[in-house]
Amino acid sequence: MNVPAPPLRLAEAAGVLSLATDLAMGQPLEHGLRTAVLALRTARAMGLSEDEQVTVYYTGLLHFAGCTAESEIDARFFGNEMAARPRMMTVARGSRLELVATAMRTAHAGSAPLARAAMMARAAFGGIAEFRKWAASHCDVARLLGSRMGLSGPVQQALRHLYERWDGNGMPGELRGAQLPLAVRLMQVAQDADVACQYGGPALAAGTLTRRAGSGLDPDAVRIFLSLGDAPYKGLDAPSIWDDAMDAEPGPQPVAAGARLDECLSAMADFADLKSIQRLYRKTGLSTRAGATLFAPSTGSSGGQASDLCRRAR
């Protein structure tokens, strides 16, 4: 008897992906979940509509969704990308001086002096172009992933502008101020707050957000977040907030089933393979071959069995 695969909540799929991106970006597990919850609590305090809250929630979960696309650039620029990423996260929306100084201290740390000197010369002449390429590839992959997962147009639009800044000095530098989607502005405040909390709790987060208000961050979003005191952080120090993050999803809680589920899983598989260009579409190809084998006349297998094996292969 064939039992069809149960539908999958899109929030669960996005949540699983956010856990993977936490690891890929060198962040503590559930950073993405905490970012989504912090941003959503701010959105609710602002009285945003349910649809707007949905966009904020999924933007928070998937703000690292394009991280595998930048691996090659990160490795070329920094050497040890996994050591560099968490350090760069602490200054991503800081001042230009903070960003450049941290990049110089981090890039190819431990290498011979001549090698580091060559890297610094290259960074001085091509660093900005490299980072623009980095941001564009990350955002393009994130938007495409959101599309293939069946997320709404506003979510996909937000995922295109993850690395823009309030002052217009972000990447790729196309938007500034209120031109940035509100979901992105709230996500950025929440992300910076969570990263700072890892090092010094809400007090350090408040100082960090205050310094960046009006430059890297939306000053109104910072003001509203800080006006809530410690309330946004309530319960986020638990060993795991998975259940709370899933329960927090606003709106009708959409699911993926059948062909939509297959496309969602294929998108997640391609995301994983993008870490290495040599492995691109490997998981998708594996699942296709698995299905072809099961559909061979000699196997006598049903379509349901083939679909199940394809999902397992991904």
Annotate each predicted stretch with a short phrase.
Residues 2-314:
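Histidine- and acidic-residue-rich, metal-dependent catalytic cores
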